[in-house]
Amino acid sequence: TDLVDARLRGRMHGFDPLDDYVAWIKSNGDGNARITIDFDRIRRFFCDKQVVIDEFHGSGRGYLTRLVGEAGVRYTVLHAQRDPDLPGLDYANPEEPFIQPLKEKVAETGAHLGMGMDTDADRYGIVDKGGIFFRPNQILPMLVRYLGIERGLTGRVIATQTDRKSVV
């Protein structure tokens, strides 16, 4: 095929960004003014808790599990295999009713938190230990409030048109 030929001729090289991305996240973005991530605090908070991650067979698989694993957080993962046929999923979007397998696994394992992301990892959903599902439009205002009030951070918040009313 053309791809095989391009690789054989040295015109195309593949790479796995996972190691570099995880290192960048753990270094807090190399001083690019991101909010720092306190992995020790995450480790302490989750020391006796578990999380469930639903990767929806997508391209984001392995990233979040690697980060929480390196933070010392125990986790269970769903739909971790690369499979474009999306077996076991009616629709690969982390929203109700399609987040039901994540909600069930959180309840079954007694996990403290469930996190799901769609197949290209640009959408997410959160399930709390009581099985309540939170959309990004519910999570983002809570996060902005926490960062502004509890952490005393100031600055601008950039939001999409759909998020704007919930974070302003």
Q: What are the residue ranges of the model-derived segments?
A:
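Short Gly/Thr/Asp-enriched flexible loops that form oxyanion-binding sites at enzyme active sites
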Residues: 122-140
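Conserved acidic residues
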Residues: 112, 155
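Conserved small/polar residues in nucleotide/adenosyl-binding loops
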Residues: 167-168
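Gly/Ser/Thr-rich loops at beta-strand to alpha-helix junctions
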Residues: 56-61, 121-122, 163-164
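Conserved phosphate-handling catalytic cores of large alpha/beta enzymes
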Residues: 148-152
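Gly/Ser/Thr-enriched, mixed-charge loops and adjacent short helices
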Residues: 1-109
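Active-site phosphate-binding/coordination module
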Residues: 1, 119, 130
